[in-house]
């Protein structure tokens, strides 16, 4: 499993957010979620947030309208935030919600990018380079209005190189 390659709490929390977003997307598309749920059990255990999985497993009402779906997701997010606060997990919460928000933005724009269960690690998928460049563009645009985001752009920049290097190393090892 590639999840073992996520070393820090922050990476795990971000990956957890990405997988939670994908879980919702797959549920909405009526696609199987077993792989992703297995990864989430692992990540939520590592992060000591077992309660999060119960909140995220709740399904939106069948045939929900866009408004109903949006309301459901907002409520789900609020429940998650409250539970995180009660359990003193604010640090994990920020990273997790960040991962979730970015993944939703990307999947809405390109539904083909849903992470395929545990086959591809949330941190190192072949889609990740695409994701990173999209995030870089978004942060660069927003930095004009939110100066704090400039720092984020600088943090993200070296990531695409790292992902590319890791993926190249993997490919050569696979041969």
Residue map of PLM features:
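Regular secondary-structure segments
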Residues: 24, 102, 106-109, 160, ...
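A cross-kingdom marker for long, charged
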Residues: 144, 148-175
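Extended amphipathic alpha-helical interaction segments
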Residues: 64-149
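Exposed alpha-helical structural elements
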Residues: 2, 35, 39, 55, ...
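Domain-length accessory/inserted modules outside core catalytic folds
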Residues: 23, 41, 48, 132, ...
């Amino acid at each position: 499993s590639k999840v073992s390659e996520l070393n820090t709490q922050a990476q795990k929390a971000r990956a957890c957010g990405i997988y939670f977003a994908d879980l919702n997307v797959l549920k909405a598309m009526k696609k199987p979620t077993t792989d992703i749920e297995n990864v989430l059990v692992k990540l939520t255990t590592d992060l000591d947030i077992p309660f999060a999985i119960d909140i995220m497993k709740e399904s939106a009402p069948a045939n929900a309208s866009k408004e109903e779906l949006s309301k459901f997701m907002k409520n789900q997010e609020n429940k998650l935030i409250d539970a995180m606060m009660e359990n003193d997990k604010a640090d994990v919460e920020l990273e997790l919600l960040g991962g979730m928000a970015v993944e939703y933005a990307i999947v809405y724009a390109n539904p083909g990018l849903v992470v395929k269960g545990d086959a591809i690690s949330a941190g190192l998928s072949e889609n990740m380079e695409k994701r990173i460049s999209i995030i870089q563009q978004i942060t660069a645009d927003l930095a004009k209005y939110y100066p704090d985001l400039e720092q984020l752009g600088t943090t993200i920049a070296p990531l695409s190189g790292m992902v590319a290097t890791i993926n190249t190393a993997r490919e050569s090892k696979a041969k």
